[in-house]
Amino acid sequence: VAEMSRMAHAAGKQIICYKLGKSELGKELAKSHTGAIAGNDDAFNAFINYHGIARVEIFETLIEIPNLFKNKKRSKSKRVGIVTTTGGGGAMVVESLSGSDIEIIDSGLSIKKIMQDNNIAFNNNKLVDLTIAGTKPEIVNEVISQMMKNENCDLVVMVVGSSAKFRPEQAVEPLLKWANDPKPLAVYVAPDAPEALNLLHQNNVDKKTALEYV
């Protein structure tokens, strides 16, 4: 695996793995398979982190995650900026990421000024909640632009609420311009919004259809 990892990175390719064995029962079941990597899960995580291998927790994520790495330079840091149009959906993402070895960054004074200039309440530095008032293409563009330029942020997560289903032009279409940006942008669509998801997929923007994939 280590040699494969070195060859893949030399060729500019990312390795993504899914592994059983987080639970004691899972470890026992995994041992029965030929070629299984047995042993302590913490040791395995240390091994793949050292070799730059990304691990996913849900099998279906193997299908959704490649766009997050496509043409992106992987950072050793884990600093994430989160923007949302829906407070509930944004809080769910923050909760999900808080259980990982991830630092959710402060949004900074520039974004605070954008919010104040547009009369949008700014209550939490860790979660930029645009609310309905800020779900406008020009505001989304301005806020995400600041996040993407922030040198203290390695990845940006945008959470889009019901506007993704009924008005994708407000908060989904403005995100397409960053599809090929060196900094990864992941979009979590809170409601069922197939047209918005298809739009993101067609433009190679990393989309998440379940909270656990974020």
Map each language-model feature to its residues.
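Loop/helix-junction capping segments adjacent to catalytic residues or to phosphate/diphosphate-binding pockets
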Residues: 91, 137-138, 165-169, 194
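Short, glycine-rich nucleotide/cofactor-binding loops
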Residues: 1, 54-58, 134, 162-166
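Charged helix-capping and loop-helix junction motifs
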Residues: 2-4, 169-175
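Short glycine-cluster motifs
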Residues: 26-29, 76-161, 203
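Peripheral docking tails and interdomain loops at the edges
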Residues: 15, 19-84, 88-104, 173-214
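Tubulin/FtsZ superfamily GTPase core signature
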Residues: 3-9, 48
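Structural motif
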Residues: 1, 65, 136-142, 167
